[in-house]
């Protein structure tokens, strides 16, 4: 969410390069990752060290071919000749662009890197500085009385389009954009594959607004090349409950990542949210920006070790054969918790009460009404699974949930997709959490998942190692826009974004 009154210079301070991921960043969008961090992982005993050196990408590499109209949008900056009659304003624009390109930095992956990083965009925003010591709670800026009415200007050759996801053709366009251009792991081996049905679930919860599905098209051929979304949520931050938005699915076509389309997307979604009287947001990123309220880590539990090794998602540990690895990760054929069954509509009220009561112990968590509980938890095939525990007297005491998010396996001759389950909300009052999550793994395995992923938030640290999860190789930072509060530990985070 960006400031209306940004100067021309700060409006251009967000730069994209041609790396293969994108998400919410301001000054380096290339590898920001949303709620799941990277789709890749490494489950070997010795964690593979990521190469620190950035790979240089060949021109026009990666992804699918764009059509000629899209390709023609490439920026080519050449110094003007002495006899040039280029207007002064144009020369200034070229000079500014060259300065920005020369100042381009790679994304900060940790606090040490972030301390040396220049955040030209975020320094203009109502977010805490990285070195700021915070002891207070509250909004950084007061709510605006006058919000800009006109959309922000896009670079020449592009146009705004509010996406009607109820239109199957438009939904398919968004699916294609994300499938071909969204978050990849550092080695460009896996890319999230959000299904059209999953996108409807994630982007149309209760209270969703059409204008918060914000797209960018090429003016000439109407090709969809950019997107950002907001959905409403009531979020409790320590003792304050605020109506805010969750920002997600910021994506720009690979071939357009030098056009400053993403910064305008961020500013435009801010404007559209502000018009509805909302001035706070929550978002996640795999890079360090000013200033994380919490940092979490992904863990991975192998369900199909053979496939994970074959696609290089994980690696055999030292002195481990594939057969021994498969035996290590073998699971029972049936769950053991008595009264465990799929959630039904009649369970909504009980699940709501369990959820809101349980989440009160955390510093950052949603507050859900019945309609939201129905939307987020009622089972939908290939999207969301929720299993409740009903005791002998008919009372619901616990539930587990996970959502489905496959990843496309790139450059593999046999395997094209990796089926991943992501831990969602797991609430327990009587069943030990370890038993509940053991059953979650068994259910996921029986449903054909290859891997089960979980963040180390809430009480998850109590079962991760015991259930043979392996630590992932990247962090996921949580951020608040226009809200200042002390940072918190991962185990005090009670919010999961898709």
Curated annotation (Swiss-Prot):
* Principal subcellular localisation of the protein: cytoplasm
Where Phosphoserine occurs along the chain?
38
Instruction: Tell me the compartments it is located in.
Output: Cytoplasm; Membrane
Catalytic activity annotation = N-terminal glycyl-[protein] + tetradecanoyl-CoA = N-tetradecanoylglycyl-[protein] + CoA + H(+); N-terminal glycyl-L-lysyl-[protein] + tetradecanoyl-CoA = N-terminal glycyl-(N(6)-tetradecanoyl)-L-lysyl-[protein] + CoA + H(+)
Provide ranges: composition bias, Basic residues.
46-57
What are the binding positions for tetradecanoyl-CoA in this chain?
Answer: 117, 122, 250, 252, 258, 260-262
Would you identify the family this protein belongs to, as annotated? Answer: Belongs to the NMT family.
Mind telling me what this protein is named?
Glycylpeptide N-tetradecanoyltransferase 2
Q: Which organism is it from?
A: Bos taurus
Question: Source organism lineage?
Answer: Eukaryota, Metazoa, Chordata, Craniata, Vertebrata
């Amino acid at each position: 969410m960006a400031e209306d009154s940004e100067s021309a210079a700060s409006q251009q301070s967000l730069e994209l390069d041609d790396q293969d991921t994108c998400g919410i960043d301001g000054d380096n969008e290339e590898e920001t990752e949303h709620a799941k961090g990277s789709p890749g992982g490494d489950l070997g005993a010795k964690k593979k060290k990521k190469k620190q050196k950035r790979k240089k990408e060949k021109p026009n590499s990666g992804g699918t071919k764009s059509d000629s109209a899209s390709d023609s949008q490439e920026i080519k900056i050449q110094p003007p000749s002495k006899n040039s009659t280029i207007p002064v304003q144009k020369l200034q624009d070229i000079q500014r662009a060259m300065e920005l390109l020369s100042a381009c930095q790679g994304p900060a992956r940790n606090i040490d890197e972030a301390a040396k990083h220049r955040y030209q965009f975020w320094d203009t925003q109502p977010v805490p500085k990285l070195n700021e010591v915070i002891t207070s709670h509250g909004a950084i800026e007061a709510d605006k009385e006058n919000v800009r009415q006109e959309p922000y200007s896009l670079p020449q050759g592009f146009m705004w389009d509010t996406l009607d996801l109820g239109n199957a053709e438009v939904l398919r366009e968004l699916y294609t954009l994300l499938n071909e251009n969204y978050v990849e792991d550092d080695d460009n081996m896996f890319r999230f594959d959000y299904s059209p049905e999953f996108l409807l679930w994630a982007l149309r919860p209760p209270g969703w607004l059409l204008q918060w599905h914000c797209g960018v098209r090429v003016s000439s051929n109407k090709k969809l090349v950019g997107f950002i979304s907001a959905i409403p949520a009531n979020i409790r931050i320590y003792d304050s409950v605020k109506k805010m938005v969750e920002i997600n699915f910021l994506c720009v076509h690979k071939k357009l990542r030098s056009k400053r389309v993403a910064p305008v997307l961020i500013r435009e979604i801010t404007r559209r949210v502000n018009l509805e009287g909302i001035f706070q947001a929550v978002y996640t990123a795999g890079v360090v920006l000013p200033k994380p309220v919490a940092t979490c880590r992904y863990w991975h539990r192998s369900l199909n070790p053979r496939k994970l090794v074959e696609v290089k998602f994980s690696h055999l540990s030292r002195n481990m054969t594939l057969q021994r690895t498969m035996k290590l990760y073998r699971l029972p054929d049936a769950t053991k918790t008595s009264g465990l069954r799929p959630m039904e509509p009649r369970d909504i009220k009980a699940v709501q009460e369990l959820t809101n009561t349980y989440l009160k112990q955390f510093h950052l968590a949603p507050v859900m009404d019945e309609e939201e509980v129905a939307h987020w938890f009622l089972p939908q095939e290939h999207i969301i699974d929720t299993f409740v525990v009903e005791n002998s007297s008919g009372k619901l005491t616990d539930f587990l949930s996970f959502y489905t998010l496959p990843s496309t396996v790139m450059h593999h001759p046999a395997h094209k997709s990796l089926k991943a389950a992501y831990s969602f909300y797991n609430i327990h009052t009587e069943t030990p959490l370890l038993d509940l999550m053991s059953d979650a793994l068994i259910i996921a395995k029986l449903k054909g998942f290859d891997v089960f992923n979980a963040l180390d938030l809430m009480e998850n640290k109590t079962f991760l190692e015991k259930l043979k999860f392996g630590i992932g190789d990247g962090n996921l930072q949580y951020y608040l826009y226009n809200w200042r509060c002390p940072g918190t530990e991962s185990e005090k985070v009670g919010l999961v974004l898709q």
